[in-house]
């Protein structure tokens, strides 16, 4: 049996939008004060529904067209369940089965898909403390 090596890369790019991916909170990853730009959507409170950032969708569509990708006629978001400290709500909103863009190529490198997803919180591990601190300013940013 012969094997063919296959190399896959997952590249994350932070979109330059005024608000976060699924809420109206300010998208400011340079904010020095923790947990300033957060809301019940960022924290996953019960009964609160996310609303997609139209500006982010426009950016992804431009990227897709620039790489020769195809725009999906249908898209959907999934909740990927994670049990990590930097996702206190227990899930991440992401696209997988039905991304906005599929296919394309950049500098000879084939691209499978371009999709949107929220980022996790940023965790800080201080050497002087036994616990970690979370900054939700970064959640919902990608």
Each PLM stretch: what is its role?
Residues 1-142:
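Basic, nucleic-acid-interacting segments
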